[in-house]
Amino acid sequence: SRRPLNPGHSFLERHDVWDQFLNGLAKFDYTYSERIFAQIDNVLKELVKHPDSRQCMIMIWDQHLDNAVMGGKKRVPCSISYQFVHRNGKLNLIYYMRSCDVMTHFGVDVALAWKLLEYVARCTNMKVGMLYHNITSLHSYKRDWP
């Protein structure tokens, strides 16, 4: 099935990181995969129809859902958006994050972005280009260092 899992596989690997974010139903309020899944078909259609479009965006941040809970246990997502741009015969991905914990999340975030780029390129018969990754606050915590 193409339906995303909640919680996903990374949760199974790192309970110590993710348990604090589970809601009362033993799920996350959302996963990136769920938000990507809801938008990916529109991006694929747009790229096929208009390869040079500048509108191929996947938004992880949903202002109507996430702003309502700022300051509480739920938070604005660290990943904000993915933008796909076809330039010089290749599909590039511009990935914007407001914040990233380099020790516990960076590797998973980069892997997901790269796999997403490969998937969209394959579905649209485009060559894979560059991944541009912008992070406003890249940080680590003392608890994660030996």
Task: Describe each model-derived feature in a short phrase.
Residues 1-146:
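Terminal, non-catalytic protein-protein interaction segments that mediate quaternary/complex assembly
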